[in-house]
């Protein structure tokens, strides 16, 4: 049986990347929350 996690940089960026997060209101909320928490990395 194939494992569920098949890494791909392209897919990773397109779904969880900074630009994608910036586009939607919810995504911007995620970035704001991570900034407030003091995360070193805001997005992938």
From Swiss-Prot:
* UniProt xrefs under Pfam families: Ribosomal_L34
Gene Ontology cellular component list? ribonucleoprotein complex; ribosome
Which PANTHER family does this UniProt record tie to the protein? Answer: LARGE RIBOSOMAL SUBUNIT PROTEIN BL34M, MITOCHONDRIAL RIBOSOMAL PROTEIN 34 FAMILY MEMBER
Q: Give me the stretches of Basic residues compositional bias.
A: 34-44
List the gene name. Answer: rpmH
Put simply, this protein is called Large ribosomal subunit protein bL34
**Keywords from the named record:** Ribonucleoprotein, Ribosomal protein
Gene Ontology MF term list: structural constituent of ribosome
User: For this chain's UniProt record, which GO biological process terms are given?
Assistant: translation
Q: Which InterPro entries is this protein grouped with? A: Ribosomal_bL34 (IPR000271), Ribosomal_bL34_CS (IPR020939)
Q: Which organism is it from?
A: Neisseria meningitidis serogroup B (strain ATCC BAA-335 / MC58)
Give yes or no: UniProt keyword Transport.
no
């Amino acid at each position: 049986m194939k494992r569920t996690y098949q890494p791909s940089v392209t897919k990773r960026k397109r779904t969880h990347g900074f630009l994608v997060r910036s586009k939607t209101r919810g995504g911007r909320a995620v970035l704001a929350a991570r900034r407030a928490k003091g995360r070193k990395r805001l997005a992938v």
